[in-house]
Amino acid sequence: MSFEIKEATADRFEEIWPIFREIVRAGETYPYPMNTNLEEARAFWFAPGARVYFGYLDGVAVASRYIVPNKPGLASHVCNTGVMVDATVRGQGLGKKMMDFGLAKAKELGFKAIQLNLVVSTNGASLEICKRNGFQIVGTLPGAFHFRGERYVDAYILYRAL
């Protein structure tokens, strides 16, 4: 089993589209509309200024991470980042590898900190890996996430200096 992370371009988004579509359609972790189409998804993931990376397991894209300045100008030294891992390969440590890569890459790109703007309170796996990697909850957004389009749950803002 070989796992490799490479920088990606928007024209390769189709490689991770099935992963994105499955995660977003579940309505449990990302705020994108559950019926997001391919072109909308590409625009979200490859937002202006974003650097995007795909994780390949034995040559197949199974994960992705973006890193983007959280705000422009005087706050551009803080980045925002997100990651998606294919459900079929979860539990193999790939999320940890994507986290380690993201922390190192954000620092290499010159960012001083990472702010995660919306971590859903019901996303235990994400919260656990973030806490294990030095992120702290710095704010709670009551009822900020419409979980599965059925009920409102809290979301957190997480922060970590690099």
State what each model feature region is.
Residues 106-118:
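Conserved GNAT acetyl-CoA-binding A-motif
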Residues 50, 153-157:
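Short hydrophobic/aromatic beta-strand or adjacent loop that forms the aromatic wall/cage
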Residues 90, 116-126:
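Conserved beta-strand-loop-alpha-helix junction that forms the acyl-donor binding cleft
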Residues 3-16:
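A short beta-loop-alpha structural element at the N-terminal edge
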Residues 91-106, 128-132:
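Conserved acetyl-CoA-binding loop-helix of GNAT-fold acetyltransferases
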Residues 33-88, 99-100, 161-162:
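Acetyl-CoA-dependent GNAT
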Residues 115-119, 131, 136-151:
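Conserved catalytic-core motifs of GNAT/GCN5-like acyltransferases
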Residues 17-43:
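Conserved GNAT-fold acetyl-CoA-binding loop/helix
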